[in-house]
Amino acid sequence: MLGLCGQRLPAAWVLLLLPFLPLLLLAAPAPHRASYKPVIVVHGLFDSSYSFRHLLEYINETHPGTVVTVLDLFDGRESLRPLWEQVQGFREAVVPIMAKAPQGVHLICYSQGGLVCRALLSVMDDHNVDSFISLSSPQMGQYGDTDYLKWLFPTSMRSNLYRICYSPWGQEFSICNYWHDPHHDDLYLNASSFLALINGERDHPNATVWRKNFLRVGHLVLIGGPDDGVITPWQSSFFGFYDANETVLEMEEQLVYLRDSFGLKTLLARGAIVRCPMAGISHTAWHSNRTLYETCIEPWLS
């Protein structure tokens, strides 16, 4: 009898515990789900948030649950506003997003938006950006005859556009804020109210602080390619640019790198710079190309 009773004890305990089963299930740890950092997207020249519907779809599909904010500021022609004005507007928009994400955020910034984002990382001493993904952005400036320029300045060519862009009036247009004429470097350094400052090419009181702020970033992901058709030279997306003979010098040959004026050399030394060149993609297709997303963007959205 004792043996039989001993065999029945486990069943008896199960019966006693049955009323408490719902409570036990509630107390059990939930299955682990990946929690992704919020993503902030900044558009480019003449763009709007609608242009990024495919990118939004890709992120939602591969990283479900990710909070993605495509900032709807300075759309269309408003994107011609001076870049410092845009930086201030975008700063006001990203501060509350970052405040709600103590684990950090990711930035995906397209074309002109990549320069806006780099300036944001420079002026914000409390940003928490993990990956700054610069998507086909003229990080070292622009020197090319594009349809945008022909529409805005129909009587000018790239060889004489410096006469407009390096004037106080010209600096009121965003395009001129990063116009970089390699044949008039002295004028660029003196007149550029934006690019020469965030590059640390011209002395200013905030240079040291801006460099320190920029170095808070976790990863700098640079994306571009030879078939872009707009960014000129296309290597500007990787901090390369023309010398006075219009020979492209790569990032490591640029003075801003050699002097580490805003932190590029430091970032590369710590393995924080990722370069992802891709051929066969035109400028307006970067944010909708699925292969590009899977290869160059998705791996950095932790």
UniProtKB/Swiss-Prot annotation:
Superkingdom of this protein's organism: Eukaryota
GO biological process: fatty-acyl-CoA biosynthetic process
Similarity comment text for this entry: Belongs to the palmitoyl-protein thioesterase family.
Name the UniProt record assigns to this protein: Lysosomal thioesterase PPT2
The keyword Nucleotide-binding belongs to this UniProt entry's keyword annotation: no
Active site per database record: 111, 228, 283
GO molecular function: fatty acyl-CoA hydrolase activity; palmitoyl hydrolase activity; palmitoyl-(protein) hydrolase activity; thiolester hydrolase activity
Organism from which the protein derives: Homo sapiens (Human)
